[in-house]
Structures are given as C-alpha cells and as structure tokens.
Amino acid sequence: LCLDGLVPFHRYSQGAYNHFYTINPNEIGTITPGSTGLGNYVYDGAVGNIYDTPGPDPSLTVPLYRYVNIHNSRHFYTTNWQEIGTNTVGAAVGDWKHEGIAGYIYSTSQPNTRPFYRYYEQSNGAHFYTSDPNEIGTTTPGTAGKYGYVLEGIVGYVA
C-alpha cells in the first residue's frame, strides 16, 4: 500500500451539530487548533488523511462526494452519490446541492488505515464524521452515542 500523495482531511465545527470537512484549509482560513475561521467555523484538527486525486492505486479508492444543504448550510459526505441523486457539481436534488469531490478514500480496509464513521443526529438533521470512535462512543450501527448521534455506518477508510 502506497501512502504517497495523502493530504490531511480537516474538520471544522460550528457547535455540536454543524461540521465542515475539507482538504483545502484555505476554504476556512485556519489550521490552528481551536481558532475560528470563515463562517465562524472552529478548527478541530485532521480526522485522517485522504487523497486529492484517485491515488497511486485508483482501484482501491472511491470519490467522497460533498453536498451542502441549501437551507441550513450543513454538509453531507458520501461515497454513494445515489444517496442524494446527483453527482453533477452545482446540481441540487431536494435540499442538497452537490459541491464536488471532497477527496478520495479507500473503499475497503487497507494496511495503515482506519474506518471513517458516519453518524446522524435526527432532531438537528446533522451528520458527524470521524475516524476516532471514542469521539461519539459507539461503533454499533443504530446505537446512539454522545450528543445523540447514531452510527449510520462506515463511509470508507482513511490513513
């Protein structure tokens, strides 16, 4: 497994229910832990490393699509664009507008990778993603952890 070309996947937060993830820290303007950038997003740190291109072995990676809710600016990330219904940048389906590919992650577990978990908090309609299961406290699908987040599953794998 070649890890060349990996870049940090940065997480920013606006409280417990609005998170933004990017490989481009210029979108928010800071990578200083705890500092506030554009949109009042606070830098949390990197949640892992992903590729900005399909990587040295494209057969092992998949695009991680980024969508924004047009009503509340919350973001949603998935490797399965059919969950929203479009993979056309700028197109909107329902409440979600496709912003592009956030990066490329492994579709299956590889050496030196860890799961990238997706959680959902229903009352706020918020998603949370992490490679550290201790942040929410559960890795059992359907089980609620901290802040009411329920594990939906593993999106893919990050280094």
Briefly describe each language-model feature range:
Residues L1-A159:
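Extracellular glycan-binding segments that recognize GlcNAc-based cell-wall polysaccharides
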